[in-house]
């Protein structure tokens, strides 16, 4: 990027519309090619020559597409000619344009992000290698909250919504018109069902989604900073947010004439927001009435501002002391542990009954069994079955596959306080492995285990089982108290695929 910094510096009069000319500059294509932003798959780049040429960067293809962009009518393909032009390079050109959009449209965001960090020292964090770094945040914060809003973020159903979202951040009308033109031409291809594979670059689609979410969250944070409500210190009167700013301006008049009780403008700082995989949670200590207000804020925001049909059923209000919160593959809830503390002052002693609130992470056994049943490891009731598609592999390969899945799930859910459900999942995978091997050798499970012995199942021992057997005595290791031990594995770099399946 530093190599091309000189090309990207424009005077003040042109900074509002400098993106569109970049589509006609060859060095931008070189920039995209050098940074590897144009990958359709792991081994092929769309800025390479066609099959008839050497697989090198082609300036000839770049010159051709620039010439076609000067004459946009040549990029438009009538629906009657879609089948006839399928073998030509029009689809290839649209792939290149989507790659170029992914590079060019990110330039103002990158420059703005770099300028925001100037003169600031970034805080170093040494706990970014594990997804489990989020769980201390949940344990420290959620234990003080009462309610959680579980929001399913909707996707825009119309392309014009995406164009309008970018319009607030990209002040280049020419680029937006060209962007709208390419999107509608892409829909023309997609709706005609010629190419089943998406012709747009995944990086470009990810940028569109992130810009859409960024616009939504910026409005939400704006409302969050300015959200307040009027209430009396004696909790006798509660005011709605009708004509809220008028109430603020005439606050003294309202206080003196209409309400004899002491009033205060209350601003709740205990509001935490987390977003993950198209879902977001909003935790707070507010009352149920205020939680319903936030719920309708979200519904009206998506319907009125983003023109997206958003049903109120997609926003669930959960009470942490009663309901479970599904997040990161866990079912989290608050567990109340009564604790009696004896305190003595001189000659008098007191018994104080305290309640300790602790975040409890449970294993969603139903969803995991559903994922295993979907992948043919068991049936919908959780009874193990043989994996017929793996019988062509070698015995060691089959065993290694099952052991890898079993250990991944065991490591991921090792932080749960109750592991009975985890032991059930391990049992399903172990018996499924034995049934698969027995089916391959055309034998019964009993005869197969009798021939190989119990040493086969020792491969399924996880690192947790081995460590606990060395730390705790055998009597404690065999007791029922062991399943409450919480051990987090901090070497997991990605989520297990079975956790994300629905």
Swiss-Prot record:
Usually encoded in the trnK tRNA gene intron. Probably assists in splicing its own and other chloroplast group II introns. The gene is matK. It is found in: Plastid, Chloroplast. It comes from the Eukaryota. InterPro entries: Domain_X, Maturase_MatK, Maturase_MatK_N. This is Maturase K. The keyword Transmembrane helix does not apply. It holds the Pfam family MatK_N. Keywords: Chloroplast, mRNA processing, Plastid, RNA-binding, tRNA processing.
